[in-house]
Amino acid sequence: MAVIVPFESPSTASIDALVGLVAADMDRVNATILSRTGSEVTMIPEVANHLISSGGKRLRPMLTLAMAGLAGYSGDGHIKLAASVEFMHTATLLHDDVVDESELRRGKLSARMLWGNEASVLVGDFLLGQAFRMMVEVGSLRALDILSSAAATIAEGEVMQLAAAKNTATTEDEYLAVIRGKTAELFAAACEVGPVIANRPKAEQTACRSVGMNLGIAFQLVDDVLDYGGKAAKLGKNIGDDFREGKITLPVVLAFRRGNESERAFWIKALERGEISDGDLDHAIGLMTKHRTLEDTISRAHHYGAMAVDALALFPASPMKTALEQVVAFCLARSH
C-alpha cells in the first residue's frame, strides 16, 4: 500500500499557460519531429513514434521555446533546437528502459517489450543522430556545444547511477551529482540555448541555465518520491519500480542514513542483494514514513524550485515569465 504524499496543489500549478503561449511553435516542432523520424527502415518510425506519441508533456522542448521567447528571439532556429531536445530525451528513455528492463513507459508497454532491446537501443541512436543533424543546421556553434556537452553529461550521469546502483552507502551529495547529470543537465541545456541563439548577454544565458538546472533537480526529486508515494495509473509505470531495480534514490539515502541497525540490514538485503519478498515494498514505505524521507525529499525539491524562480528575477514581468513560474509550481505539485 503506497503512501500518498500530500503535495501542494495551488491554482498556479499548471503548464496550461505555457502550452498556450508556445502552441504555434510547438505545432512546428511536432511537424519537425514527425518529419525527422521518417526512414525507409520501417521499424525506425514505428519504434520512435510509439514513444513520441505516447502522451509525454513535451516539457523540455517547450522550455526551449519559452526561453527563446523570453529572450526576444525572432528567428526559427529554436524550432529545430526544441525538436533536438525532444529527440535527445526520447533517446535516453529508449536506452533507460533497456538498462532498467522496464516493462512500462507512460502507461504503455515499453518499446523493448514490443520490438526488443536491440531495436530500442538502435532507434535511440538514430534519434540522437537526427538531433545532432538539426543542431548543425541551426548554425550556432555555441548551441551545438551546449547540447552536445549535455549529451555527454547525461551519459556520465547514467553511468554514475549504474555505478551507484545497489550501493546503500551512496551519500546525498553523490546522489545529487547523479541527477544533475542524468536529468537536470538536459533541462539546463534546453533553457540555455534560447538566449544563446538570441545573442543575449551572458548574464541572461546563465540565468536561463540556472532555471533549467534547478527545475530539473526538483523534477527528479519529485519523481523519486512518486515511485513510492504516487499512483500507478497516473504515473504510467509500476509503483516501486526503483525499489525492485535496486535504485538508490534520495528517499532511500535518507532512510538508510537515519535507520537503526536492523533497518539498514533490510535495505542492504533488499537493494544490494536483491532479496525482495512479498510485503517488502510496503515495509520500505513504512520506514520512509517513519523517518519522513518522502516529505524531506519534497522539501528539498521545493528548495531547488525556489532557486529556479529566483533565477527568473533577472527578466522583466511578462506573460512568459509568469507561465514559467507556474511551470515550476506544476513540477513541484505534480502527481505524474
What is each stretch, according to the model?
Residues M1-H336:
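All-alpha prenyltransferase/terpene-synthase fold signal
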